[in-house]
Amino acid sequence: MKLFLLLSAFGFCWAQYAPQTQSGRTSIVHLFEWRWVDIALECERYLGPKGFGGVQVSPPNENIVVTNPSRPWWERYQPVSYKLCTRSGNENEFRDMVTRCNNVGVRIYVDAVINHMCGSGAAAGTGTTCGSYCNPGNREFPAVPYSAWDFNDGKCKTASGGIESYNDPYQVRDCQLVGLLDLALEKDYVRSMIADYLNKLIDIGVAGFRIDASKHMWPGDIKAVLDKLHNLNTNWFPAGSRPFIFQEVIDLGGEAIQSSEYFGNGRVTEFKYGAKLGTVVRKWSGEKMSYLKNWGEGWGFMPSDRALVFVDNHDNQRGHGAGGASILTFWDARLYKVAVGFMLAHPYGFTRVMSSYRWARNFVNGQDVNDWIGPPNNNGVIKEVTINADTTCGNDWVCEHRWRQIRNMVWFRNVVDGQPFANWWANGSNQVAFGRGNRGFIVFNNDDWQLSSTLQTGLPGGTYCDVISGDKVGNSCTGIKVYVSSDGTAQFSISNSAEDPFIAIHAESKL
């Protein structure tokens, strides 16, 4: 009995690190600013069949309507209530999406904005996405309800009331982040309001949460909220399942607050990952892909089982957040596919793929002055995600997750799940290769000259279809064929001018 109690306690403590994806599904995709009706369709027609594990959705709760500038993406990070009512859709549409996605094995992860409410400068009676009244100047949010008692104004010690130094952890947690009204999460009432919101989402069927701005909350306050959360809905999850938690903590080193302070609550976003990988793939600062042999903890990252990793996210793809100019995005499509391919092949961390929309960038003194622009819309109404005949998306939705190279690497990761990093090869420069046990092998040529080498793949002999240049269709291949000898070796040739300078084969791409 003692052993059983120990094990059940252990299971409970560690459950928040488990992504709660359906068995065999290993990645999630952030469908940034998509409507719930479009996400439901995408789960059924694409994400389910293509092996995606889940979707990170934009904040589903009511936010302030920002008109200057006109309907920026960041208005959704300015809550006014916990009603499920935004530009992405209403509560019924949200419920329908969660049900339909779960029914095809695709989980929903909610971006939970719980550190703050909207900015203090908004006028009383200002527009909101569901019509709820608020008076931010007086700290009145009757739709929750919150009042002046529920904010940290008295706790913050800076003259401005805002964060003035990131070297002071008290300021970072107790003062206002860019003027956003900072909730007093040490109050049980505030914790209960937030937990009620998250529990409603859990009961609807979501699988977990991205905790926005976690760095700006005390880890113990987050834990107190998480301790109030229900188990996941048994319609789709085993009894006793706990929500997957990943906390947004930007920690590139050199600040008072470290990611490790948050490990007790769940996983943490590893922002060093995309920043460093971008530097390597761009060949900046003398970096080379040959240096990636000990990628992961060997590069000073957090432990793999605590990390949520990504090449770019909605913030840093537009110069916000962390990582700076090295971050690769869909605007740098060729190198971006290399970086995402590397991420999805490598065992480190739990992987998230980005799915973006295009906007009219306008750089002034190196800064995109249009970084605020919201999703494709007609007079503020988010446009439908249309699907073109070639399976790409229309209406300025980028849909990186539908790019063959990325979609097929999501499947590759599923196939090699649990297999060790193996058969590393490097030319000392930017040609590298590695395998995952006997289930998969990938080769990159990021040099300015041809790659031509015979490499040990670790795979059984036979003919394989490269899933980067094409697809296995029936028993034929629309891309490059790779011939693996009985000893596991294969000859690879990759031109430095290839559209995609990498090749990937796996157990399920064998012809």
From Swiss-Prot:
The active site is at 212 (nucleophile), 248 (proton donor). GO terms for molecular function: alpha-amylase activity; calcium ion binding; chloride ion binding. This is Pancreatic alpha-amylase. One of its GO terms (biological process) is carbohydrate catabolic process. It is an enzyme of class 3 (hydrolase). Keywords: Calcium, Carbohydrate metabolism, Chloride, Disulfide bond, Glycoprotein, Glycosidase, Hydrolase, Metal-binding, Pyrrolidone carboxylic acid, Secreted, Signal. Disulfide bonds join 43-101, 85-130, 156-175, 393-399, 465-477. Its EC number is 3.2.1.1. Glycans are attached at residue 427. InterPro entries: A-amylase/branching_C (IPR006048), A-amylase_C (IPR031319), Alpha_amylase (IPR006046), Glyco_hydro_13_cat_dom (IPR006047), Glyco_hydro_b (IPR013780), Glycoside_hydrolase_SF (IPR017853). Chloride binds at residues 210, 313, 352. It is found in: Secreted, Extracellular space. SUPFAM superfamilies: (Trans)glycosidases, Glycosyl hydrolase domain. The keyword Metal-binding applies. It comes from Sus scrofa (Pig). Transmembrane segments: none annotated. It comes from the Eukaryota. Its cofactor is Ca(2+); chloride. The record marks 315 as: Transition state stabilizer. It holds the Pfam family Alpha-amylase_C. It catalyses: Endohydrolysis of (1->4)-alpha-D-glucosidic linkages in polysaccharides containing three or more (1->4)-alpha-linked D-glucose units. Belongs to the glycosyl hydrolase 13 family. The keyword Disulfide bond applies. Binds 1 Ca(2+) ion per subunit. Binds 1 Cl(-) ion per subunit. Ca(2+) binds at residues 115, 173, 182, 216. The two forms of this enzyme, I and II, show very similar activities, molecular masses, and compositions and differ only in their isoelectric points. As no evidence for two variants were in the cDNA library of PubMed:10082956, it is most likely that isoform I (PPAI) and isoform II (PPAII) are two forms of the same protein. Its main location: secreted.
